[in-house]
Amino acid sequence: MKSPYKSSLIVDLVLNIWQGVPSLVLHNLEKAHAIKKIFWHLNVDQFAGCYIEFGVAHGHSMRSAEIAERTSESKVIGVKRVYRNLYGFDTFEGFVSHTADDAHPVWEGTLYTAPINEIKRRFRKSSNVRFIKMDATKLVEAEGNIVGAERFGIDECAAIILFDMDLYEPTLSALRWSRQLLQTGTFLLFDEFFSFGGDSNKGESRALNEFLEANLDVQVRDYGSYGVGGKIFVVELA
């Protein structure tokens, strides 16, 4: 029988390996898993709609979605693939916000940015993936008018929308724009929902709260969490 000391050393070894995995890697892997589960869930119901992503960065989430889109099927149990278009919005130049409330020690500058040409090259074989170079804060014009989705060639409701811009202002603007594409059953993913020290009056949490207050016909059900601070909701329209 092993001594408690030797057992503890084995536990320490395992924990050192596990805790040595960068948190960013774990977060992205859990996000990829969440995206896979959602695509599968939608396909079981044969639920139609496109995938939209705000905040493409280097394209890892979009690649997760692209793979999930073409692999979420099973002949054994009769789950058929639902062919979907995937759209990625990003400035491809860095974080954008015009309010001091979005000041953050990490989410600024161009650290998480890749040129759109590099992203397009990465997805050159994915004909159902489109990237749109756009500052999300301009999806709602100064007069309050919402830019029509048809301007970007989108003529279908959304099945999944990922908000990965971390900050309040662009996320609220993207939510307001997305209202025209929502349907009961649309999944909303927020990648940094508990940021800014957990202050619900900042970041993505504030954006969602304000959007729901202004759109009383839209309700959301809690679907779950992923990664370091990701949150998932399902839309219900009144």
Predicted regions: what they are:
Residues H33-F47:
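Conserved alpha-helix/loop element of class I SAM-dependent methyltransferases that forms part
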Residues Y5-L26, D45-A238:
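S-adenosylmethionine/decaboxylated-SAM
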